[in-house]
Amino acid sequence: MSDAIAGPEQTPNRNFGFALDVDGVLSKKTPLPHAIETLQLLHSQGIPYCILTNSGGVKDEDRAMAFTKQFHVPISPEMVVQSHTPFLEVAGQYKGKCILALGGISSKVREVARSYGFDHVVTGSDILTAVPNIWPFAEATEAYHKANAQPLPMGPDGHPMPISAIFVFATPRDWGFDLQLIHDLLVSHGGRLGTRSAFNGNTALPNNGFQQDGQPSLFFCNPDIEWATPYCEPRFAQGAFKAALEGIWASDKPQGTRMLNVYQCGKPTTESYKCAERRLSLLQKRDGRGEPLQRVYMIGDNPASDI
């Protein structure tokens, strides 16, 4: 294989590319046998590829740097599709508006959201610090939230800006509080905390009046119910958090009331595969690799989440 690894200037026309999973395909904590050589071969032969993973919680740039170091081959941010990377493509819809970003640790979720172009980003820590009595069970987490809080962005009326969308970037660490926040906003008037829409429960309106009053849209990025950790059994992941929210939503609403305006990306959703395909096509065009892509091969190890 080493004889085939030349410089990246050897770029014959290719009309195919690869989307590669990481865990179980390229590495298991450390690179699997021949993973590094395979990526080097793709690079030297001018074959476009991207890393498609349900990991998240850090900026695409930081993930790309980590992959570059791990696999000893240059991987740019454009070659990385994390679970939340498709959020980048909807950021323009919220220009000048305020979003709630949930999940992950410390302030990393805020950094990720801002790297995608969201102008005004609020986290659960910001809200709990500004309105301590919004969550009565903060004894174990209050210090953590205060350490990671920033002031709430204010609107021209002197009040906190309304929340126009909720983005779950990674599995939340404070489930109870985050579930409360999301539910509060989904039944609010226009995405303003501390309000409740007068339309809720009106059976003469669509969806029994719920989410008919300017409430925020809701975005999830990883449908996995469980994931592998050092513990001997799988642990709950973001998909389980979404299921918990759906259970709460259904528990006290009139029969047939749906949770509307919910967007889901992350493997194996169509949105994530389309995002990967668009990125590969841009890489193909940017690097002058000849004809447009005709095929993209997905390499994974779990049909339930990779296909």
Where are these regions (language model features)?
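HAD-like aspartate-dependent phosphatase fold
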Residues: 1-307
